[in-house]
From Swiss-Prot:
Pfam families: Epimerase (PF01370). It catalyses: 2-phenylacetaldehyde + NADPH + H(+) = 2-phenylethanol + NADP(+); 2-phenylacetaldehyde + NADH + H(+) = 2-phenylethanol + NAD(+). Its EC number is 1.1.1.-. It is an enzyme of class 1 (oxidoreductase). The gene is PAR. InterPro entries: Epimerase_deHydtase, NAD(P)-bd_dom_sf, NAD(P)_dehydrat-like. This is Phenylacetaldehyde reductase. NADP(+) binds at residues 42, 161. Belongs to the NAD(P)-dependent epimerase/dehydratase family. Dihydroflavonol-4-reductase subfamily. PANTHER family: CINNAMOYL-COA REDUCTASE CAD2, NAD DEPENDENT EPIMERASE/DEHYDRATASE. It comes from Rosa hybrid cultivar. It comes from the Eukaryota. The lineage of its organism: Eukaryota, Viridiplantae, Streptophyta, Embryophyta, Tracheophyta. GO terms for molecular function: oxidoreductase activity, acting on the CH-OH group of donors, NAD or NADP as acceptor. Keywords: NADP, Oxidoreductase. Catalyzes the reduction of 2-phenylethylamine to produce 2-phenylethanol, a constituent of floral scent in petals.
Length: 322
């Protein structure tokens, strides 16, 4: 058990909530930042966690408000920076996504640079910052931590979320090099599994959409990973002294057709979409290396279990009923 003090930013989020849960379980004192500590949908599920009464402190902080993380990170040994904007339909990508992602990350790291107690920062990045380098991705291609997304590829294809994660991670590495901060990044793909927070998150919404009467399924192949593995990887990346650099987290890459097949086997009575959203050839799958992630002790919960946990969780929260 640990009696260390750590900070989790964006603590009400999907990954962060699980991270707070694991940290409290392990005996940490957690300073958790949220944008609005007075909003019960953002804090109630955190305050209900085991150990929260004794060891969870909430702080108000905003990604774009300079210095607003100073008090949250002060006196901490570790900082887990998970807060980041995520929208699909953006009208003004620069204002809505790019600036907040980069400025927010640098704002948190700047607060960290003022606190001498901090031993390591663990940054929640994304496979988005890894895999889009213009190289074709096919079933025999293995994406690993040496890949870096090319911002020009993102701009050409208008992949604004991908660009935001890429620029934020890149800015973070430059900043920590300059300031001598020890940082590790976790780069998960589509994160699914049980929800602790009461509101729907983006990746669970993708599953909800296909089980709740969507006419078509997307022509897309994604890497999939369980939220519990992602939260655990963050903890291990902080606790294991030799952890360094980036860690891709993907249990497997699957096209939506495979995802639907698994859901059909789990829930044979569910009406699922049978038609693809376009007539193009299916986007091929690819591989993502697990070597580094395994060095953190991650054993990878299989996709079928992750899908079942996601759907059972959506039912439990009455977000879907069947």
């Amino acid at each position: 058990m640990s009696n260390k003090v750590v900070c989790v930013t964006g603590a009400s989020g999907y990954i962060a909530s699980w991270l707070v849960k694991l940290l409290l379980q392990r005996g940490y004192t957690v300073k958790a930042s949220v944008r609005n500590p007075n909003d019960p949908t953002k804090t109630e599920h955190l305050l209900a966690l085991d150990g929260a009464k004794e060891r969870l402190q909430l702080f108000k902080a905003d990604l774009l408000e300079e210095g607003s993380f100073d008090s949250a990170v002060e006196g901490c040994e570790g900082v887990f920076h998970t807060a980041s904007p995520f929208y699909h339909d953006v009208t003004d990508p620069k204002a809505e996504l790019l600036d907040p992602a980069v400025k927010g990350t640098l704002n948190v790291l700047n607060s960290c640079s003022k606190s001498p107690s901090i031993k390591r920062v663990v940054l929640t990045s994304s496979i988005a910052a890894v895999a889009y380098n213009g190289k074709p991705r096919t079933p025999d291609v293995v994406v690993d931590e040496t890949w870096f997304t090319d911002p020009d590829v993102c701009k050409e294809s208008k992949l604004w979320y991908v660009l935001s994660k890429t620029l934020a991670e890149d800015a973070a590495w430059k900043f920590v090099k300059e300031k001598g901060i020890d940082m590790v990044t976790i780069n998960p793909a589509m994160v699914i599994g049980p929800l602790l927070q009461p509101t729907l998150n983006t990746s669970a919404a993708a599953i909800l959409n296909i089980i709740k009467g969507a006419r078509t399924y997307p022509n897309a192949s994604f890497g999939w990973i369980n939220v519990k593995d992602v939260a655990n990887a963050h903890v291990q990346a902080f606790e294991i002294p030799s952890a360094s650099g980036r860690y891709c987290l993907v249990e497997r890459v699957a096209h939506f057709t495979e995802v639907l097949q698994i859901i059909h086997e789990l829930y044979p009575d569910l009406q699922l979409p049978e038609k693809c959203s376009d007539d193009k050839p299916f986007v091929p799958t690819y591989q993502v290396s697990k070597e580094k992630a395994k060095s953190l002790g991650i054993e990878f919960i299989p996709l079928d279990i992750s899908l079942k946990e996601t759907i059972e969780s959506l039912k439990e929260k009455s977000i879907v009923s069947f």
